[in-house]
């Protein structure tokens, strides 16, 4: 008899973390590795945010538990943030804070999914959605988007996938891994469809502040009151404020669902690290100048690297509008190098050149790879040179 649960045996390892682990192993062996696999900014957390955490340690506030669902002061900061960037305010009972947006997503699925409930996920999708749904006995239902439609789902596709078991749809705009952004018109159509059929909307807004070249991010929760009431917003401070190591995520939405998520937090992790909560308060309502500095740096990298990547033999890439990833189709590149599997292709690239990319298979796109441009320009240019040489070899 196996010692492990069915749930764990059916679970896949995160492809992004697995790729990063292999890259770190090669680095430890002395290899020259260029890691473009992890989705984290290369900037140090801004000093004002660091100081807020250190102050809470020095004055003793960080020494103790807080309310499991988050400091009241942090919930108030999130409400202020929503007033400023979303245009509406939320009450404390509509907010739960937890150990990273990834865990908050898990808590949401645990709070609303019953066995065999279906959750519609447009592909490509962020790697953890599907496994978290399955871990909670739900059924992920994938709808394949097209490059021609900029990797965005349509109401017609959603309706074709809908059954009497459909509980929720997942929207991630700007998208990881594609960088696409839904327009207000597209979101309105999807939101009205969800309201009509009483389907919950999970809106993963983690990259909402990172948009480029005049693109605009519209949160679906701002479209109308009925759509807002149907939506649970997932967000955090990791990407916008370069705080991936602080593990601060939160959800905003229906008080009943948020209350259920708060119960799950109280029985699993308890409160988020107290010092990190004080840091998050400063991030959300403190000086925002560094956000624009980082956004401009990402935009410069995007605009510099995109034409170089587009020239790599066998790589076909759509220019992203947000987040910090390229997601090229490498079907021709695989054919040119004699590979039929994208994971074999990325493995060979890593072993031969030291460039770590993420296979698209884990994102539901077996002909694509993901490259993060959340690293310095020198590294990015050298990585493209190595990929070019690999393809021309």
Curated annotation (Swiss-Prot):
Enzyme class: transferase
Source taxon at top rank: Bacteria
Catalytic activity: a 2-oxocarboxylate + L-asparagine = 2-oxosuccinamate + an L-alpha-amino acid; L-asparagine + 2-oxoglutarate = 2-oxosuccinamate + L-glutamate
CDD domains associated with the record: AAT_like (cd00609)
Keyword terms, alphabetized: Aminotransferase, Pyridoxal phosphate, Transferase
Modified residues (N6-(pyridoxal phosphate)lysine): 239
GO biological process, one term: amino acid metabolic process
UniProt binding sites for L-asparagine: 39, 126, 176, 370
Presence of the UniProt keyword Transferase in the record: yes
Cofactor(s) this protein requires: pyridoxal 5'-phosphate
Enzyme Commission designation: 2.6.1.14
One Pfam family hit: Aminotran_1_2
GO molecular function, one term: pyridoxal phosphate binding
Keyword Magnesium: no
Family recorded in the similarity comment: Belongs to the class-I pyridoxal-phosphate-dependent aminotransferase family.
Functional description taken from the UniProt entry: Catalyzes the transamination reaction between L-asparagine and 2-oxoglutarate to produce L-glutamate and 2-oxosuccinamate. Is not active with pyruvate as amine acceptor. May also use other amino acids as substrates.
Protein name per UniProt: Asparagine--oxo-acid transaminase
The species this protein was found in: Streptococcus mutans serotype c (strain ATCC 700610 / UA159)
